Amino acid sequence: MNVQHKLVLASGSPRRIELLGQAGIEPDRIHPADIDETPQRAEHPRSLARRLSRDKARKAHEQLQGEAGFSGALVLAADTVVAVGRRILPKAEIEDEARECLRLLSGRTHKVFTGVCLVLPNGNLRQTLVETRLRFERLSRLQINAYLSSGEWRGKAGGYAIQGLAGSFVVKLVGSYTNVVGLPLQETVGLLADGGYPVYANWGTGKV
């Protein structure tokens, strides 16, 4: 494959890998970019998602420079942020964080922002930002405790995974479902196609 058609995913997220596979896209390399994800003072959730996706893409691109076979590859990165109003919810790592997230989301509308950034072989950036609005039903103590016991919340933005048990909490969703999972598929495929990646190459090969 032409090096300019090689794709590096700057994320180790199984959900993002699966979503790309759903569109017939298999990255040539998985290269997670480790960056400081701390929000800046008074930073809007939308701005945070955009900035982090850009920083991840740039870092991965820089790390691959001079590496045989990948220095001219396309680099794709994404970051998902969940917010209630302007309050950014954490990627829950401990149960108390997840409990607080679920308490805040209970009966409320919240927004999920995913920034997607593509670094072209010449180093130029292409970005998009997708917003989805959701509302959870009012959660009982039983529901919250049961969900916490499942462990699905661990490492998830906002303390839940919509593609799992928490999908049963959703009363209303406006926008991209795959955005909430972690990668807005329609917009990402469009970004890759515009960047010169052969997104439809595998559709007629039986590899999808």
Swiss-Prot record:
GO CC entries: cytoplasm
**GO molecular function annotation:** dTTP diphosphatase activity; UTP diphosphatase activity
Where mainly located?
cytoplasm
Q: Which CDD domains match?
A: Maf
The coiled-coil regions, if any, are none
* Family matches, as PANTHER family: BIFUNCTIONAL DTTP/UTP PYROPHOSPHATASE/METHYLTRANSFERASE PROTEIN-RELATED, BIFUNCTIONAL DTTP_UTP PYROPHOSPHATASE_METHYLTRANSFERASE PROTEIN-RELATED
UniProt xrefs under Pfam families: Maf
The protein's name in its UniProt record: dTTP/UTP pyrophosphatase
- List site positions: Important for substrate specificity: 15, 80, 163
A GO biological process held by the record: nucleotide metabolic process
Q: Which cofactor does it need?
A: a divalent metal cation
Q: Which InterPro entries match?
A: ITPase-like_fam, Maf-like
Residue segments, region Disordered: 28-48
Q: Which family does it belong to?
A: Belongs to the Maf family. YhdE subfamily.
- Gene3D superfamilies registered for this protein in UniProt: 3.90.950.10
Q: Where in the cell is it found?
A: Cytoplasm
Q: Name the UniProt key words of this record, in alphabetical order.
A: Cytoplasm, Hydrolase, Nucleotide metabolism
Could you tell me what this protein does?
Nucleoside triphosphate pyrophosphatase that hydrolyzes dTTP and UTP. May have a dual role in cell division arrest and in preventing the incorporation of modified nucleotides into cellular nucleic acids.
Catalysed reactions, as listed in the record: dTTP + H2O = dTMP + diphosphate + H(+); UTP + H2O = UMP + diphosphate + H(+)
Q: What is its EC number?
A: 3.6.1.9
Q: Write out the catalytic residues in the record.
A: 79
